[in-house]
From Swiss-Prot:
Signal peptide: none annotated. It comes from the Bacteria. Its EC number is 2.7.1.148. Keywords: ATP-binding, Isoprene biosynthesis, Kinase, Nucleotide-binding, Transferase. Belongs to the GHMP kinase family. IspE subfamily. This is 4-diphosphocytidyl-2-C-methyl-D-erythritol kinase. The gene is ispE. GO terms for molecular function: 4-(cytidine 5'-diphospho)-2-C-methyl-D-erythritol kinase activity; ATP binding. The active site is at K14, D140. SUPFAM superfamilies: GHMP Kinase, C-terminal domain, Ribosomal protein S5 domain 2-like. ATP binds at P98, M99, G100, A101, G102, L103, G104, G105, G106, S107, S108.
Length: 275
């Protein structure tokens, strides 16, 4: 079996600086507005292409069965869309991005897989040309293929490059698994009714995460603890990870030391570009 040299890729996390849910579409997705930026928290994926015609995925943590795995689904979508047959590849995933956190780890891995496949099989394709394919895998996958901080509309596939002033971010995550489907149908979800202009700067008075009310209603004790730590903590995606932004790294380090509950926490930096 002839193997090429293994190639390493990094797969970055994202946060939603705000997330407004507008309405449900006929295809089951929701129209939204959000502003994505990236974090220097990343997974590592190693791709070894070969002539085995087999797809093997391994990881340092327990992952979904192949047919339910977004990386596997990305490979199959790539095959179908670009008529690339007989793909043989071994993929080793080293996870650092927590799962079920709203940081987009699974979507990021899927996007990285599309990029690795493109690099090997169809190097003439641009990242932008793969965005419609990425959208078929999930609403968060396009931003990771795009690779730049962006304002997003539609289901997340209409992207406008929009830098965010670099900051430090303190991430905290309780041991809570969020059901995205449950949050979307919750009576506590108050959808945004007014479109806001993508030309606005970051304005927390009108930019919020519509899912925070759902989380606060479901987990009032943690929500109260969070507000006592700092009222500017925000949720990314549908949670359960919250973040606090600051240009002052020392401030965030001091706050992290005050946390006296068993929460996962990270101190990271925001990134405008990941490619």
């Amino acid at each position: 079996m002839a193997n090429i040299k293994a190639k390493k890729y990094y797969s970055y996390a994202k946060i939603n600086l705000f997330l407004h849910i507008l309405n449900k579409r006929t295809d089951g997705y929701h129209n939204l507005q959000t502003w994505f930026t990236f974090l220097d928290l990343k997974d590592q994926l190693i791709f070894s292409f070969n002539n085995s015609r087999e797809i093997n995925i391994s990881s340092n943590i327990s992952i979904a069965a192949k047919q339910d795995n977004l990386v596997y689904k990305a490979i199959k979508k790539f095959q179908q869309s670009y008529r690339v047959q007989d793909i043989g590849v071994d993929i080793e995933i080293k996870k650092n991005i927590p799962m079920g956190a709203g940081l987009g780890g699974g979507s990021s891995n899927a996007a990285t897989t599309l990029i690795a496949l493109r690099d090997y099989y169809l190097p003439q394709l641009s990242n932008e040309e793969m965005i419609p394919l990425a959208a078929k895998l999930g609403a968060d996958v396009p931003i990771f293929v795009y690779g730049k901080s962006a304002w997003a509309e539609g289901i997340g596939e209409i992207l406008y490059h929009k830098d965010f002033s670099p900051q430090y971010a303190l991430l905290i995550k309780p041991d809570i698994h969020i059901s995205t489907k449950e949050f979307f149908v919750s009576e506590d979800l108050i959808k945004s009714s007014v479109l806001i202009s993508k030309d606005l700067g970051f304005d927390k008075s009108i930019m919020h995460n519509d899912f925070e009310n759902v989380f606060y209603a479901k987990y009032p004790e943690f929500s109260q603890y969070l507000k006592e730590l700092d009222s500017d903590f925000r949720m990314t995606g549908t949670g359960s990870c919250f973040y606090l932004l600051s240009a002052d790294k020392n401030k965030l380090e001091q706050l992290a030391r005050k946390i006296n509950k068993p929460l996962d926490k990270w101190l990271v930096k925001t990134l405008n570009y990941v490619y």
